[in-house]
Regions:
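Cytosolic regulatory regions of ion transport systems
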Residues: 1-447
Length: 447
């Protein structure tokens, strides 16, 4: 597949590295020679100095026979313009990063589609959804709803109160049980488990279940004593914080701390809500945190632009009694460190954006792709097509590669867990988990 990426910034360079490992034909365009040089020689891709809004630059990059054009510069107008130009010059599909929430409305997206932009992506809004999913269920590290909750994936850290430790999964999670364990992160190892595998203390386990059985999962993992989050402290008042706070339910009281006085005044203007308080100060200032009630706060969210600051702030909050912490960690190298320090939910906009864009590379009908950063695994929602390989035999006879498991499916709006005897039908929405497997090898089962 031929792909052009416009913008050698955080998301663009991350995508370029990720996709070049998949042996895709990548061209990265940027105006800065320095930014292009920073991607390193270890990536198999072409770089081109130029403006993505230049017709000549796009033609020189070979846009006329490009399968996917991705515009992820920090400038919204550049992304929109270059995507429209690319489509009209021959690119099959285009993606543009935007900063305006108005553009994400369904009518606006249809309007942009008519102009030639296949998909709009707003990483801060996607991150805000993940942040709120983590806050609404303080006992869960990661949550993903499929088909409005027909199926739910929960990533949970297992501690001493868990009832299902040290037992083979075949004894605790049979075909008739209301959950499947679809992945386990143990230290630095990721396991796609079989029936003889066991859950161990401090594992990060990924459960697939239906919404009705979430309370049951909470009970068996020993998390019933975790209080629901009703007050939140946010450090950093950037765009991600604004989007996250606007999505918070009304029952959550929120304090935003930012050290930029002008930014605080701006936040006061745009977040005119009784349950939101803006505080001018440094979120690392322990006396300030104490004065603002950190010891009675149920969740702390660190969203500054500095990963080290966010990690340290969350550690401080945990030592001061805050149970639920969320940290923005944009430096991928720091993610495993944050995990080892027991930072709760980790947000990485690059990873979120990459997952969203990756689904456009697949030929199968894919509704969602999510990279489970903590487990170094992928989960995708495939639609089974008529006469596809996955509909020909029961799951146990499909010959899926090692490192792949099917966690559940949605049929006619109803979530179902999958066993070896399950027969997938055309039109089913199927959840597939992969570890160290290129998703391209899985899609052939669904087309």
């Amino acid at each position: 597949m031929k792909i052009i990426i416009a913008g050698a910034y955080a998301i663009g360079t991350h995508l370029a590295r990720l996709l070049s490992r998949s042996k895709e034909e990548i061209t990265l365009i940027d105006e800065s020679e320095e930014r292009l040089a920073s991607i390193g020689s270890d990536c198999d891709l072409l770089t081109m100095i130029g403006k993505p809004t230049s017709l000549q630059t796009l033609r020189d990059a070979g846009v006329e026979d490009t399968d996917l054009f991705i515009a992820v510069t920090p400038v919204e107008s550049t992304n929109i313009t270059s995507s429209i130009l690319a489509k009209n010059l021959g690119a099959k599909r285009t993606v543009a990063r935007v900063d305006n929430p108005e553009y994400m409305e369904p009518q606006a997206q249809e309007f942009f589609k008519e102009l030639g932009i296949s998909k709009l992506i707003y990483p801060e809004m996607l991150a805000a959804v993940d942040i709120n999913n983590g806050l609404k269920m303080s006992w869960v590290r990661q949550r993903w709803d499929v088909h409005d909750g027909a199926l739910v994936m929960l990533g949970i850290k297992l501690r001493e109160g868990c009832e299902i430790l040290n037992e083979p999964l075949k004894n605790i999670s049979g075909p008739n049980d209301p959950y499947h364990v679809v992945a386990i992160k143990r230290g630095s190892e990721t396991i796609i488990p079989g029936g003889n595998d066991e859950l161990k203390l401090y594992d990060l386990a990924y459960f697939m279940t239906t919404r009705n059985y979430i309370p049951y999962i909470r009970k068996i993992v020993g998390k019933e004593h975790y209080v629901d989050v009703k007050n939140v402290m946010v450090m950093g008042g950037g765009r991600t914080a604004v989007r996250a706070v606007k999505k918070m339910p009304e029952y959550m009281e929120c304090k935003i701390i930012d050290k930029d006085e002008n930014r605080c005044e701006y936040l006061n203007d745009i977040l005119d809500d009784n349950h939101i308080l803006i505080i001018h100060g440094d979120g690392r200032d322990i006396p300030l945190l104490t004065e603002e009630g950190i010891r009675s706060t149920q969740a702390f969210v660190a969203l500054t632009g500095n990963a080290e600051t966010n990690i340290l702030a969350c550690l401080t909050a945990k030592r001061m009694g805050v149970r639920k912490t969320v940290a923005a960690v944009e430096n991928v190298d720091y993610v495993s460190m944050a995990e080892s320090l027991d930072i709760g939910t980790i947000i990485n906009k690059k990873m979120i954006a990459a997952s969203y864009i990756y689904q456009m590379m697949l030929d199968a009908d894919v509704m969602n792709v999510r990279f489970l950063m903590s487990a170094n695994a992928d989960v995708a929602e495939f639609i089974a097509k008529e006469d596809s390989k996955v509909t020909q035999k029961p799951v146990k006879n499909l010959g899926m590669p090692i490192g792949v498991t099917i966690g559940g499916l949605v049929r006619n709006g109803e979530g179902m867990l999958v066993s070896g005897n399950t027969q997938i039908e055309p039109g089913d929405s199927v959840m597939v988990f992969c570890h160290n497997i290129n998703m391209k090898k899985i899609e052939k089962y669904f087309i």
